[in-house]
Amino acid sequence: MEKDNDFKDPFLASTEEEELDPATQKALMEYLGVGSRASSLVSFSSTAVDIPPISGVGDFVREFRIESRKLWKLAGPAIFTTMSQYSLGAVTQVFAGHISTLALAAVSIENSVIAGFSFGIMLGMGSALETLCGQAFGAGKVSMLGVYLQRSWVILSVTALFLSLIYIFAAPILTFIGQTAAISAMAGIFSIYMIPQIFAYAINFPTAKFLQSQSKIMVMAGISGVVLVIHSFFTWLVMSRLHWGLPGLALVLNTSWWVIVVAQLVYIFNCTCGEAWSGFTWEAFHNLWGFVKLSLASAAMLCLEIWYFMALVLFAGYLKNAEVSVAALSICMNILGWAAMVAFGTNAAVSVRVSNELGASHPRTAKFSLVVAVILSTAIGMFIAAGLLFFRNEYPVLFVEDEEVRNVVRELTPMLAFCIVINNVQPVLSGVAVGAGWQAVVAYVNIACYYLFGVPFGLLLGFKLEYGVMGIWWGMVTGTFVQSIVLTWMICKTNWEKEASMAEERIKEWGGVPAEKETLLN
C-alpha cells in the first residue's frame, strides 16, 4: 500500500483486499501470536472477521444495531465509572460551596488549575496504554499487557514526584498568574492537603487503561460506584457533623482515590486477568524511552484539551468581581464535566473498539465503530442539554448559597447547553485518535485550534469587547468546534487499511517487541 495514500479512501467505501494463501495466513497467525487461547481472548473485544462494505441503508441499520450493542457493553460501565470518579471531586466542591463563596472559589481553582494541570499530564501519559494495550490485545499479544502496565507505573510515579512541587508552591504560582491574594492563599493550603491524590493518579490511570483494554470495565464500575457512596457519606459526616472544613474535605477525597487504587490492584493480583498479568518483571524497565515518547505524546494531546477549559476558569479570575465570576463559571464547568463523563465513557469504549479492531486487522469495523459512537454521543448531548435548559432556574440552588452567583449561572446556562453538545462529540473523535495512535499529530491540531485561535478569540470577546465570562467562553468553544471539524476531516480521509497494517509496527516501536519477531514473513 502506498505511503502517500493515507487520506484517499472514502470513509465507508469498499476496498479490495488481497487474499492470502493458506501458508501465508498460518505464518501470519504464528507471528501475531494468535493461537487458540489468544484468539478466544481477541474475540471478546473484536469481531471475528471484518464487517462487509456498507452499500445501502439496510446494511447501515443492520451494522448500526450490532455495533451499538458492542459499544454500549463497554460505554455503559465506562460512563458510570467516569461519572462516579468525577463526582468524587464534584461532591467535594458542592460541600465547599456551603462553607463560603471564597472556599468554593479556592477549591475550584485548585481543582481546575493545580489538580487540573497534574490530572491532564497523568491521565494523558496513562492513556498511552489505550493504544498499546488495545492494539496488543487485538493482535493476541496478551502477555505484554502486564509489562506495559508496569512500565507506565514506573514512568507516572516518577512524574508524580516532580508534579508534587506544583502542589507545594501552589499559592505563589496562583499569585504570580494573577489570582487574588485570598483565593491564592486558601487554594494553596488546599493544594498541599491534596498531594497524596497525585500519587493515586500515577497508579490508577494506567491500571484503569489496562483493565479497559481487556473490556474488564464492569469491575471498575462496581469499585467506583461503591467508593462514591462511601465518599459522599464521609464528606457529609466531616462537614455537617464534625465541621472539619477544608482539611476534612481533602482527607476524604484523598482516601477515596486510594481506595479505588487498592481495590483495582487486588482484582488484578488475584489472578483474574489470565495471561495479561503474570507478576512483576524486570522487563518493565526495558525500552522505557520508546514508552516515554508515546506517553508524552498522549499527555501533550490530552493536556492541551484539559488545560484549555482550565484556562477559562483562570481568565475569569481577571474579570471584575472575580469571586462571583470564578464561582459561577466553576459551577458550569462542574456540570460540563459531569456531562463530559458520558462522552469520556464513549471515548473509552470507542478507543477500545478501534484499537482492538485495528490490532485484529479489521479496518472497516474500526471506522464504522466511530460512526456509531458519534451518532450516539450527539443524541445523548442534546438530551442532556435540553434537560439543563428546562431546569435552569432550579439547579443552581444545589451548588451555592449566594444568590448573585446563582443568577450568573442561570445567565450562562444556554451557553453551557450548547457547549455540552459540542463537547459530547469531541472526546469521541479524540478516542479514535488514541485508539489509532495519532496522539502527536492531534497535539499539533490542538495547539493551532485551541491556543492560536480559541484563546485569543475568547480574550478578544471577553476583555476587549467587554462581553465578560460569556465572551471568553464563546471564543473558546469556537476553538473546540474548529478542532472537531479538523479531526473529522482527518478521520474521513484516513486510509484505515493502512492504519490496521501499521498497528503491529506501533506495538513494536512503542512497546518493545522481542528482536526475534522483528521481521514479518521474510
Curated annotation (Swiss-Prot):
Principal cellular location given in the protein's record: membrane
Spans traversing the lipid bilayer: 89-109, 113-133, 154-174, 183-203, 217-237, 249-269, 299-319, 324-344, 371-391, 415-435, 441-461, 471-491
Summary of the knockout phenotype: Short root hairs.
GO CC annotations, alphabetized: membrane
Name of the coding gene: DTX31
Coiled coil stretches, renumbered: none
Transport found in the keyword field: yes
Keyword ATP-binding: no
GO BP, sorted A to Z: root hair elongation; xenobiotic detoxification by transmembrane export across the plasma membrane
PANTHER family: MULTIDRUG RESISTANCE PROTEIN
Location in or out of the cell: Membrane
Family: Belongs to the multi antimicrobial extrusion (MATE) (TC 2.A.66.1) family.
GO molecular function terms attached to this record: antiporter activity; xenobiotic transmembrane transporter activity
Membrane topology listed for this record: Multi-pass membrane protein
Biological role: Positively mediates root hair elongation.
Name of the protein in question: Protein DETOXIFICATION 31
Entry keywords, A to Z: Membrane, Transmembrane, Transmembrane helix, Transport
Organism domain of life: Eukaryota
InterPro entries per the UniProt record, alphabetical: MATE_euk, MATE_fam
Species in which this protein is naturally found: Arabidopsis thaliana (Mouse-ear cress)
